[in-house]
Each structure stands twice: as structure tokens, then as C-alpha cells.
Amino acid sequence: MQDDALADLAARGIALARVAIGAGATLAPGLVSRLQFGTTTPAQTVAVRMLGARDLALGIGALLATRHGPSGLRGWVEAGAFADAVDALAFLRAGHSASRRRGLTVLVAGASAAVSAWAARRLDA
């Protein structure tokens, strides 16, 4: 499989995952908060719902942009990469204790940021 086809597949796959995660966080922020942080507070519920809406918008935007070809998709993939990189850094800097939840979030968000950045560079090549 050529790099451009693999980049397109990766971008679409991440967009679909972003829609699923975003929908879950938007519709069930208490559950996602418990899974993510181990607790649920009103502030966490609001933050999770807001981040869920962000991911839902980025994922839907990317999927809709596929109608315009790779050049239309690239900006959405770059925006998603940026959001995931910020999420990874925020969780990395959150607190001094290492937890499995925190480590998993940093790993998943960091990997998504890296793959998205790679795909974005190849989408319009």
C-alpha cells in the first residue's frame, strides 16, 4: 500500500475513532470521567463533555472533508493532531503520581498525534 493511501486510511480511521470517543464523552460524560479519572465531579463532567464535543466536531469535520479529497482533509487532520498533542502534554504534566489511566491517555493521545501528523504531511503530497 502506498504512503498516500495508508495516510488516507489512517486519517479516516482516526476520524471515526474521534467521532465514537467524542459521542461517548458528550452523551455520557460521567461514565467517561470515571473511566478516565477514577472519579466524577461536576467540573470533570463539564470538561469531559466539552472535550467530547470538540472531538466529535473534529471527527465529523474530517469525515465531511473527505468529499473534497486529500487537500480538504489535511487541515482537519492537522487540527486533530494538535488537539491530541495538547491532550497528551496536559495529561503528562497533570500531577506527580503515575497512574495507569494517565499513562494510557498519554500513550493513546500521543500516538494519535504522531500518526495524524504523519498522515497530514502525506495527504496532499
Question: Where are the predicted features?
Answer:
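Short amphipathic, positively biased membrane-proximal segments
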Residues: 1-125
